[in-house]
Amino acid sequence: MLRRTFLAGLAGGTLSARLAAAGRTNFVFILADDFGWHDLACYGNPYFATPNLDRLAVQGARFTDAYAACPVCSPTRASILTGRYPVRTGVTDWIPGRPSHERGPITTPRTATEMKLEETTIAERLGPAGYRSASVGKWHLGNKGFWPIDQGFDENIGGNHSGSPPKSPKPYFGPFELPNLKAAEGEFLTEKLTQAAVDFIGRNRSDPFLLYLPHYTVHIPLGARGADVARHEAKANGRYNPVYAAMVESLDESVGRVLAAIDEAGIADRTIVFFFSDNGGLRYEGPAQKPVTDNSPLRAGKGHLYEGGIREPLIIRAPGVSKPGTVIDTPVSSVDFFPTMCAAAGLNAGDVDGVSLLPLLRGGSLRPRALFWHYPHYSNQGGEPGSAIREGDWKLIEWYEDGSLELYNLRDDIGEKTNLASTHRDKAERLHAQLVAWRKSVNALMPTPNPEWKPEAAATGK
């Protein structure tokens, strides 16, 4: 309620803010779904052709150590929009989550089933300053009443409660109906969302705007245009799925069309473009464990606290701010995007967990800090409940089932192959103490023993 009162007070100045907003920085945030750190050519993958994203990296800054605040989707999305860790928003697992008793010896806390209206989103922060805003694509942060329009966006195109793309009769293809987005038979979802984004840019070229473009692609069930799939089948090498590769190509095409629309509108010099993914790459699809992508050299993938589950590709093009072609290895998090946009718009970010990345983009540095994760759930991908901290080159994971610790030096061991917890006990103990103190400071909900767990049944599979 306090947030709503605050925003209502600001709304009285909206007209004057819009009149004063000419020339203000625009923001385009493109979010891929389940897209791996290694799924871009500019990140060293020779299999995928991503010329538009590679060009964006050449024109802007590419981050090597960027992280999602959670190894699954909904919590990271909330962190992007609020600048707050999942443990604070209460969205700590994908919505609606799964019953914990199905999996293991501990009962995990329930995740919130929506991003609360009391949270202040970046759209609500920018709106009173004269910004128009649209969410075009996947929302997955609650049922009706908690959709983008309820969270400060002026427009919602294609976003609802669902975490998956339309799949009937064919994944990603019409006919389907999403909020303010209808598709006839055979129309391709990624193209429809891209066109809606391009149209929004064209309508708002004279006003400052926030375009949040969270694509459904490359989330399963996989679906792509037949001609694109055929091209990739010809070069399939067993490590990558040709349908997935075709989806990556369509995502790259979308980025190219959005960049072209920015150029055509004549606003490239005052538009900051972000490209990011909500969690690590999905390695396998379905009960048959059909390969989807390969996250090497990172360990594991979506749903896991290892690097393959949380390290993401991040590209930011900020004309007049960053030197083209910059590569940044400072660890950053999805909680940092909210304060970055606020700083670029000349606004106070308020009480958030993230920090502005503008100093890094300008060639400077950030104050030393630790990054934190709290994922007290069993994931659909086999990930186990735990939490983690990264400080400098060091990363420590605590597993909630048995309290065991794993310590890695990521500079020397990006694949997390050698657990150093026993040989670097002082480092492990210090990082663990920091992690425990952080969890207490944010009132993290912790797992409890599972009374329904039967180890003998788990061992026999009965």
Where would I find each of the regions flagged by the language model?
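N-terminal secretory signal peptides and thylakoid transit peptides that target proteins
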Residues: 1-14
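Long, internal low-complexity/basic segments
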Residues: 7, 23-25, 32, 36-37, ...
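Loop/turn elements at helix/coil->beta-strand transitions in domains of secreted/extracellular proteins
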Residues: 24-27, 60-64, 129-133, 154, ...
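A short beta-strand-to-alpha-helix junction
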Residues: 45-50, 67-72, 109-120, 183-193, ...
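Short, structured active-site-proximal loop/turn typified by the sulfatase FGly-forming signature C/S-X-P-X-R
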Residues: 46-78, 83-88, 132-134, 154-160, ...
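Histidine-centered active-site microenvironments of extracellular/periplasmic hydrolases
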Residues: 147-152, 221-224, 260-321, 333
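C-terminal cap/loop subdomain of S1 sulfatases and analogous C-terminal strand-loop tails that border
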Residues: 155, 281-305, 322-326, 330-410, ...
